[in-house]
Regions:
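Long alpha-helical scaffolds
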Residues: 10, 17, 37-40, 117
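Acidic, metal-coordinating catalytic segment for phosphate/diphosphate chemistry
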Residues: 27-30, 34-73
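N-terminal strand-loop-strand
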Residues: 56-93, 121, 125
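Unchanged
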Residues: 99-123, 131-189, 205-206
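Nudix hydrolase/Nudix homology domain
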Residues: 1-33, 164-207
Length: 207
């Protein structure tokens, strides 16, 4: 049996436990839901060989009814090349990250482009709205429910500066993408962004 089904079960247990902790007023029930949450973390730790503390930091720190997180990616394409950033782990990705409260999805795309790539951009239109687990995540982190929004962005100007998240940036043709790409964006998703760039009538893809 593949790890994927165990990740799915752990994800469901985590969601049930978090909802129970939010709504239950009974002390004994909350203790049971807390135990269910810990079991889900222990399952993921065994599957992934990641430390239990790391798992709990990711999955056991939220409160309230569990809803998907939102990740925004900026597809900055200029003269047929896409701007990617190299993360501290050596992997390349489109600039992006968790959407900040108080900003619209498009505003988040603009912010992430500047913070991670030093690029001033304009968010033109959405390319895709994807469920991370269905398109990107096959490791333990895919247990987090994430919606990924890709925006096609026009490049204005900018200058890269190394920062706490990225150490390098570069422009790439689709046929010359770096080998070590992050799971934060697949080659298929990058290809969709090029298709949107080449076709003004491109229709946003969604799960």
């Amino acid at each position: 049996m593949s790890n994927e089904i165990f990740i799915k079960w752990a994800r469901e247990l985590q969601s049930i436990a978090q909802a129970g902790l939010h709504y239950s007023k009974d002390k004994f029930e909350t203790e049971r839901f807390e135990r269910i949450r810990n079991i889900s973390a222990e399952m993921l730790s065994k599957i992934s060989n990641e430390p239990i503390d790391k798992i709990k930091d990711i999955f056991c720190c939220e409160k309230g009814y569990q809803t998907p997180k939102v990740d925004v990616r900026s597809a900055i394409i200029n003269e047929g090349k896409i701007l990617l950033v190299r993360e501290n782990n050596g992997l390349w990705s489109m600039p992006g990250g968790w959407a900040d409260v108080g900003l619209s999805p498009a505003e988040n795309a603009v912010k992430e482009a500047f913070e991670e790539a030093g690029a001033n951009v304009k968010a033109e239109r959405p390319v895709a709205i994807h469920d991370w687990q269905k398109n990107n995540g096959k490791n333990f982190e895919s247990a987090v429910s994430v919606y990924k929004i890709f925006f096609l962005c026009s490049y204005i100007d900018g200058k890269f500066k190394e920062n706490i998240e990225t150490i390098e940036s570069g422009w790439f043709l689709f046929d010359e993408l770096p080998e070590r790409c992050s799971v934060k964006n697949t080659n298929e998703q990058i290809k969709l962004c090029f298709e949107a760039y080449d076709d003004i009538n491109f229709i946003c893809r969604f799960d």
